[in-house]
Amino acid sequence: MLDDSFHVYDTTLRDGAQQEGLNLTVADKLVIARHLDELGVGFIEGGWPGAIPKDTEFFRRAAGELDLKRSRLAAFGATRRPGVGAADDPLVAALRDSGAPVVTLVAKSHDRHVLMALRTTLEENLAMITDTITHLRREGQRVFLDAEHFFDGYRSNPGYALEVVRAAVEAGADVVALCDTNGGMMPNELADTVRAVAAATGARLGIHCHDDSACGVANTLVAVDAGATHVQGTANGYGERAGNANLFSVVAGLQLKKGRQVVPHDGISEMSRIAHAISEVTNVAP
């Protein structure tokens, strides 16, 4: 990672691995992580330890086999369950014990999803966010938050979506990534929303886009123009349904078109080779 002022965050090993027909072994994930480290991404999300046995094994093996020079590993997981303290939740404990210096938590930011999917109150969801971030920070880990379905939630209840962002920041999250989970946003509306959230909360914002409307890369780039300093995506745009924002295209757009260095120069010169090397592992064309 060049410095902490701008994050390139890869989620190939977790979100990208959800693509139909893509079945990565632990050994595959270790190889891909080494390629991403060559590129010089800031963070590599390794998976969900505790919830997915293969990902638990990845973090165990990574501790002894993965010598990252440029990137840092991140563990992905959820906030604590309703009615259970973060210190008593075994899935939160698995994040703590993963060995990853960074944890990215996913949390509901759409009021209807809190009520219908989590089957809890809006207040308890905020408490879950606060408690989990506070606990992991106390354990010495850096915490990012993925605000799931944020843009749909902001349309439905902007006040509550903003409460989620504020709760995360006040608890100690370094970044709140706004997620276009359904991939339905258009660039103009997305950029306007990012600006509004930044102005209302003062949070350091990230962006996580899916490509269902073929706007994943464009939406990521306009989010940066609107103030986001943390971009998420996957190698070759891998991901469920239509895929995630192609992180290689995002990096090229930022560095070659907009003049913003986000990975080392030797990394970007090798990006085409790295894209094809990863496709050899996944057996999915770039």
Label the predicted regions.
Residues 1-286:
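Catalytic cores and adjacent flexible loops of soluble metabolic enzymes
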